[in-house]
Each structure stands twice: as structure tokens, then as C-alpha cells.
Amino acid sequence: MADVKRVYTFGNKEAEGNGKMRELLGGKGANLAEMNLIGIPVPPGFTITTEVCAEYYSKGKEAVIEILRPEVEKAMTNIENLTGMKFGDKEMPLLVSVRSGARASMPGMMDTILNLGMNDEAVEAVAKRTGNPRFAWDSYRRFVQMYGDVVLGMKPVSKEDQDPFEEIIEAQKEKRGVKMDTDLTVEDLKELVVAFKAAVKEQTGKDFPACPWEQLWGAVCAVFGSWMNERAILYRKLNNIPAEWGTAVSVQAMVFGNMGENSATGVAFSRDAATGENIFNGEYLVNAQGEDVVAGIRTPQQITIEGSRRWAKAQNISEEDRASKYPSLKEVMPTVYAELNEIQNHLEVYFKDMQDIEFTIQDGKLWMLQCRNGKRTGAAMVKIAMDMLREGLIDEKTAVLRCEPAKLDELLHPVFDKTAIKNAKVIVKGLPASPGAATGPVVFFAEDAEKVLAETGQKAILVRIETSPEDLKGMLDAAGILTARGGMTSHAAVVARGMGKCCVSGAGELNIDYKTRTIKVNGYEIKEGDWISLNGSTGEVYLGQVATQDADLSGDFGQLMELAGKYATMKVRANADTPRDAAQAFAFGAEGIGLCRTEHMFFEGERIKAVREMILSDDEAGRRVALGKLLPMQRGDFEGLFKAMKGYPVIVRLLDPPLHEFAPNTEKEQREMAEVMGISYEEVVAKVEYLHEVNPMLGHRGCRLGNTYPEITEMQARAIIEAAMNVKATGIDVKVEIMVPLVGNHKELRYQKNIIDTVANQVFAERNDKIDYMVGTMIEVPRAAVTANQIAEVAEFFSFGTNDLTQMTLGFSRDDIAKFLPIYLEKNILKADPFQVLDRNGVGQLVREAVFKGRGTRPELKCGICGEHGGEPSSVEFCHYAGLNYVSCSPYRVPIARLAAAHAALNQK
């Protein structure tokens, strides 16, 4: 492979690469090349390609060095020619930086080395050439420390130990009686270099390398090695960056911001990364190296006068003190500022996105070290995209694709005040199950959440080992939910997301004692009534009350949603069980209800007694009496839903969970039911025990209930049809779709459809009127997917219940997966939680097969998805490619799904 080009040079407004070569040169290398080509002042250098990273892991360090040597030596000569300095020279030594750069930005995840090329001879030459020995020795000290850490592995022996270099620095400062690194003299710095080298020799058994070429090869290989360090691996997992991409290595001539009062270093953004405002902003430090800006050793100053004045006001600093002690770059170096401002404008217009730029001013000359598309908040993301669309920088399609669907979550939920969160005490961390911020007093039981709200008007934090459907009302009345057990798709997580309610689940360190009503965690004891705060976006739980603020859904958000609707070809519905849920979903742009779970209605108010009367009855007659009480309640619920959706389709799922979920479990409830039904307490206890199942998720539930107790299906069908006809009579169009759950055999579905059709015809005869309705099924049993051609003979639509379909296909319990999921992710057995991200190769194949077979029988068959995957962007993309008509998700995930559907359509084109 001798003809393969592995090194690309840049400098003096020329480059062998360009900005489109991100896969080969990484984001940093591609942008450095592109900045050269458009005339931006960039220190010369070269980039070693990402392909060499793969060779490093397949061929080994020594082989890669030999392969690279000719090209790297030639590229270094190019830097020497452009700078007038020579690598390893005793008079005019060239110093370089060595940095990583993957195709996707991974800030801070991999290692960087500055001032490479320094040795005992070079430091004297630099001191003589600059007339600044302190600068020279400080640069040497920094290099030995950085190289020792990154390349030579000079780490603390144990986690309790201090960094070996920092320990030496602290000892030197104590010896000299000073507090800051900047107070150390030239002689102090010389002593530090000697001590650093001695520490390297003692810990590694090797001398610190003096040869610049040995230093360079060590650094290049260390950067490749850092691609597989723990933090880089974790970052890639969190951001879905494939390990096979690899990293490039960029080697650049050093420029120094710490050469005196006419030098500086800084970081800037072409727009505000927090708000999206079109305001140039950033920070800089005079006479400093890049790391000093973020190290907090000195107070960085603002680049613009406006920014400087805003900062001073926030710090209660007078204008007089600001101007004298913390002036802006514009005031200190007006000519350089003007050039920097012109460059940031040029870069933003050229790259057509908000830019994050790093710069150094060396002796009055401005150099750009990096530019990249800046990271931003969800609010800033939307504002920048819509502003750039209005400014004519980008078109509609680019504006839509520029906005990440998952980041919309940040706009839809309350958030913590940024200042308050910095001072908050984290007591435990769980799973970020539902985004948002919540603060309130702790309660342990659902009824107490209701009670606290009713008596004080204050919403509480409901803390449970795990939640159940009976906790629904309490969850609704709570500010947030915290559970010790359960994953991202546990009951608490799913219901909380549907409510737009903040939730942290699976906080396994919590020791919850219901009897004493206390939580013990990490040395803290929290009692009922004590305040805690939940961060549903990070999973962190804070002690006490942390201030929150409402998220602002601006006009830009609405405009983005309009554009998403314009380009998406797949519809988005919502999973909604109440008129309030439906109204919220409609406000977010849902085009129907893809799942209304009728059982959630059974837990409200006095209804639960009627439900319990029905399940505890010994015969059909008794069940029918109880169902007669439920009929008007269910009918009223459906009327509210149909009205809220204003003519959009509504899928109502018939009763799905096993009956034991509704059973009275406490002695108080059981005695109450005995009195209501006129039977003995012992009879109630016996019936509850009879209802208990060993494996209820695969037991007497779904269509199996409707087929063994047809009167349940009859009542629900009547409630649905009558409600639809009542709403139709008010002039509102109604599109009813009745869904039969847990079908695995077409005969099960046919039996249920016959009941529904019979009841519908009875109601039509009674009313002397008709409505259109459809009967379909939930595909959640694998057998239904592989026999979809038979199922479609009966079903008029399919809705994939991917929560249960995932459970039954993978054999994973979604409530217990948290026990082994982290290990499976770490070992790369699974790439993602299959209950969050659809398993395309397994569950996805069943979906594709069912769609294909179903439409083979019934070409016009409408297919959708109603599991939690319906709101996850990559799963929405899969649904688009699989040919589904719609996805359905929690109301607060509707905007995310709409944007993801638009992305899928645009990316396919």
C-alpha cells in the first residue's frame, strides 16, 4: 500500500486536503485545511489520516512508525520552510502541538500535547530568541508534564493519590511560600523540570526523551492510543460514534499566547451557544497559553465590549473597575479584535453554521487554531436554525436537518436555574427516565401526593421502590417521580414521559423504608416532608430545593414544527388516555391518537370499586352488573377524547393487563369490597389469591380476557360506539379504530371482531344511525408477526406494540433488564437498550415481515407503531424505511417524532 497517501499538509493559505474530507482527516484536520484554502491565518502543519489509526491497532506501533516516517519527515520539512525554524535545531528550534481529531467532535475526550520539541538545548534557544526565559522554561515545564502524563503514563498510583507532577509543583510552591503557578520564578521552573524528569525516571525506569523525533513518534502513537481510552469509549457510546471511525492526528507549528503583554489566547463563538442570539462572544487571557483560559487560574476577560459589560454587571463590578482591570479584547487590541471579528463572520458565512473558534495572538499577530460547528443547547439549536433560514444562509431542508430531534426534549420541560444547579448537592444518580426539573417534599405513597397537593397546593416528589398503575393519580399530582427499581421503559418512566413529568428511575443506591417513611442513601437520611430535587435530563437527585424555570416555547419552535410537517411523509400520533393528554398531543401537532389504554381510566375515583366488583364476581350475571356501572364512565371518557382530537383518528385498545392488577391488595380494600358485594372477607381473599398468576405478562390478559369474558369486550365496544355517535351528533367528525391486544392467532382476533361488530350493529339499530369504524390488532406476539398474512384477513390495521414485542422476541423483562444491561453494553453484546432503541435486526425484521405479509393479504392495510420506540429518533427513522404509515408516542415526544420523521424523509431523498 505504498501509494496510499497518509499525510496531508497545510499552511500559507494552501492545503492538500479540504473541508469535505472529514472521514479521512477528521473534523479538526478537514477544517484546518479548509481555513487555509479560504485565506484564514493558520499555523502550518499536517494531518495523519484516520486510516492510520486503524493500521495502528491492526499492525502495531513500530510498523506504523516505519510506514509513516517518509511522509511525516517530508511534511515536517514543509513546516520548517514556512516558519524559518527547524525541528530539533539548536538555534531556531521548531516546536509543535500534537492533537487528535475524529470526524465527529469529541471535546476533551482524547489527549493533546503542546510545546513538543523542547529539550535542554531548545529551551535555551527559545529563551535567547524571545528574550523571555520565564516563557521558555514555563513552556518546557508544561511539555514535560503533558508528555509524561499522556505518553509515559505518569498517573497517580491509586485514586487517593495526587497527580505526581502536581504534587511536585505544590511542594515547590510551599517551599517558596507562594500560592499561584504564575508566582514561580525562572529558577523555580528550572528546578521543576529537573524534578519532573527525575520522577519520570523513578516511576518508569526510563529517561525522559530528549530527541524531538522520539518525542513526536511517542506523541502520535499516544493520540492513536487515546482513541480507546475509557472516557473516549464512553463518549462514543453516549453519542453513537462508531469505534471503527478512528481518529486523525494533527501536528501544527506552535504559536504562543504567553510571550508577553502583546500576546493572548482565547475561545469564541459566532453566536450565543446557550440562547442562540446572533451575538459574537467569547473569552480571552493576555499573556497565557490556551489551557489557562479554562483552568480557572486567572479570570478570563470578554472579547466584546457588550459582553464585558454584561459580565461585569453580573459580577457587581463597576464600569470603572471593569475598564481598568477586565477590559475587552476590543479595548485592549482593537486591530486584532477587528480581524478576529471579520474572520468569525467569514467562517460562519462560509460553513453556514455557528462556529466555535480557538485563537492565539502571538506578539500582535492573530492565528486561528481551530474552528468547528459549535455545541449548543436545544433552545439555541432551534433559534440559530430559524434565524439562519430567515437570513438566507440556509434553506428550509437544511434548517430542519440542522435540528437534532432528541435535543427538542430540552425545550418541552421545566429546567433548573443555571446558577442554582452549580451549588446543588448531588446525593444519588439514577436513570434519566423523563426529562425536566422537579423539586418538592418527599412522599412515599400516591395518595399522599394527592393529599399534599390538595392541602397545600404544593406538588410533592413521589418516591417509590417501583410504581404500579394504582399510583397513576399520585404520579399525576406529583412534581416528579423517583424510583429505586425499573429501567427507562419501566412503568414509572413510560407514564412519566406520557405526562411530561420529570422522572428518575433505577436509583439502586436508595434504601427506601415505607414503614419509617425514610430514605437512606450515601450517608444521608431523608424523611417524609424533606425536600429533594430531580434532574430528569441527567438522572441526578439533589438535596433540598433547587430553583426551576419554565422552558420557553418560542415562535421559532412553532416554525420548525411547520417545516417538519411539510417534509415528513409519515404521520405522528400520540399515546393518550385522557382528554387532557389528547389536548396536549394535539397542541404539539399530533395527527391522531395511536393508543388509548382503557385500563388507565379504571383507576380514577369510584371506578376502581366497580372494576373490582366485576373481577371478584363468581358469574357472568355479576360481572354484567358491575360492567353496567362502568359503561357510562367509559363512554364519557371516550367522548372527551373524540372531541379533543377534532376529527383525527383515535385508536382505542381494549382491556389489556391481567385482572390481578386491579385486585384489592390491602386488608382495608378487601374488607371494603366484601361490604360492597355482600360477601365475606374470606371469599374476597380467596378470589384475589385465585387471580394471582406466576407469569402474568404471558398470562390471562389481552384478547384472552375478552374471549373468556366476552361481556368485557361487549361493554367496551358499546361505550366506544355510543361515544362516537354522541360526538358525531354534535357536528364533530369521528374516526374510531378499535384495537384488540395480544393477538397471536387469527382465530382469537376473529372471535373478538365478531363481538365488536355485533354490538356495533345493535347500537346502530337502537340509534337508527351509523358510523364508520375499523377493527385492528396490536402486533406484539412474535407469532402474530410471522402469521401476519392470516391476521390481515381479519384486521383492518396493524399497530406494533414494540414494548411487548421486544420482551417476547429477546426474552428480556423490561422491568428487570437494568440488572444486566450495563454489563451487556460494556461488553458490546448490546449496542443500546432495546427498550429505548428498536432492535432492527431482530424485532425490526419481524416488523418488516409483518408489514410485507399483511399488505400481501390486504394491500391498503394501515400500519403504525405505538410502543415507546415511536418517540426515539433512530427508531422513527427505521419505521419510515419499513413503510409504516405513522408512529405513535407519548404527547411530550410528539415534536421529537415529527422532526425525526422529517429527517428520515429528507435523508432518504
Identify the residue ranges that each predicted region occupies:
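Short beta->alpha connector loops at strand-helix junctions that form conserved
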Residues: 46, 484-486, 505-508, 596, ...
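Glycine-rich phosphate/ribose-binding loops and adjacent secondary-structure elements
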Residues: 365-367, 461, 468-476, 480, ...
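Nucleotide/phosphate-binding sheet-loop regions of phosphoryl- and nucleotidyl-transfer enzymes
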Residues: 1-424, 458-461, 468-473, 479, ...
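Long, charged amphipathic helices and adjacent flexible linkers at domain junctions
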Residues: 70-73, 238, 400-453, 458-461, ...
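C-terminal accessory/binding modules appended to enzymatic or scaffolding proteins
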Residues: 14-22, 434-477, 843-859
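Flexible, glycine/threonine-enriched loop-and-boundary segments that flank and lead into catalytic domains
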Residues: 231-269, 438, 446-448, 455-456, ...
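Conserved alpha/beta-domain cores
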Residues: 99-100, 553, 563-909
